[in-house]
Amino acid sequence: MIVKGTYFQNSEEKPLVYGDVEIHNIPRRRLRGEEEKEGIIAESVFVGFCGTDYTLMNMGREGNLKQKFPEGCNRLINGHEGVVWVPDENRFAIVLIRGGNSYDPTRYTEEETYFEYGCDQADGLFSDKNYYNPDMLLKIPDGYVKDGKIPLSICKKLVFSDPYACMIFQRERMEDIGEAQNFRVKMAQYKCSEAEAREIARKETFDRVCIFGLGTTGMFIGDLIHQRYPDAKIVFVARSEESSPKVSFALKQSGASYVRSAFDTNEELADAIREKLGGTATVFIGSSGAAIEHEIAFRYGVLGCNGIYNSFSLGPEIAFDTMPFGFKNQVIFGSINFRQDHMEEAIRILLDSCYDEIVELIDKDEFTEDPVNAYENKIYAKGAPMKTAVIWNEQYII
């Protein structure tokens, strides 16, 4: 089937183009042990832009996308965030992005395979239509759709289903690791049972949280920690002015404090973070993509003894002195994924959120006329909105 869409290709001059593209119904499985299923057609309604798209575009410019293409193709239709319409089932849906031959997408092993719609070996949402495994088209709860149309405000909220699900998993991982890391010392401290100590350790994991970076992922994890642990002391660190709308919105959502990264030295920045936290961090979450994250946490001592370093950035290398690291009993982990239950929970939470307020639209014609220019000079340019999205098919939106 030939459809209109944008797709990545290996080309220095045109790594992302819009035009006719052939889509293929490749059988796919959701999880290991399940049968492969042919896809059913879903029409793209509302699609968001993600930093992964920008990274993939640059990979195409450098000729490094071959391993990302679907089998038998020399291009990848991008897009993995948004709302689709499923004609055969007369409903809207959110696409569960990751599937394949793994028992648990958050714990895949080297011998297991996976795919991601719009990112890795499977075409995504930036086309008029596409094929999706029917088990991976998640339902939107009743009460938000009327007469086959969906409100724009709901679409804006649900465009975050993927990254918000990622952050729900991040919170789960920090809970699991923090509990396992510190329950024995809590047994000794509180003279209590193992079950009681595990609960205490899980909660105290979030006593003092430093979130380095204030994109949507940093904002979401702060929000989610605050929802479950309202007494947690949360400090965001970023370069924006504290009076900026982005910072104000994030602080309101999470009840957090803020340190602007505008000091002359890293020592001064680290001192300011510790002062805001009221001590060293029990959890340090790196989400800025900058190498300074690990330096502030380890070299300049913001991460405390028995603390957790959550590396959510892609790109920076982490370095640390093994002597203090070992004696401080710290843990470093990285896990960028989520399960279906995480995304279903994200959908429920987002529907009652105010995250539609931070989504701005780009006109579809403006985007498709020159996708590369739109990416570089509007969507990911300095001063761009926190989130940009496009109405792909306006007939379904009210």
Language-model features and meaning:
Residues 99-208:
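NAD(P)H dinucleotide-binding glycine-rich loop of Rossmann-like/cofactor-binding domains
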Residues 1-3, 178, 268-271, 279, ...:
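C-terminal hydrophobic helical "lid"/dimerization subdomain
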Residues 238-243, 315, 338:
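Residues in the short beta-alpha loop(s) of Rossmann-like NAD(P)-binding domains
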Residues 216-217, 242:
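Hydrophobic/small residue at the entry helix of a nucleotide-binding pocket
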Residues 307-310, 320-360:
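Rossmann-fold dehydrogenase core element
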Residues 178-212, 226-229, 244-331, 397:
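Glycine-rich cofactor phosphate-binding loops and adjacent beta1-alpha1 units
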Residues 29-48, 61-107, 123-124, 136, ...:
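Glycine-rich beta-strand-centered segment in the early N-terminal region that forms part
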Residues 163, 213-216:
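Glycine-rich Rossmann-fold phosphate-binding loop(s) that bind the pyrophosphate
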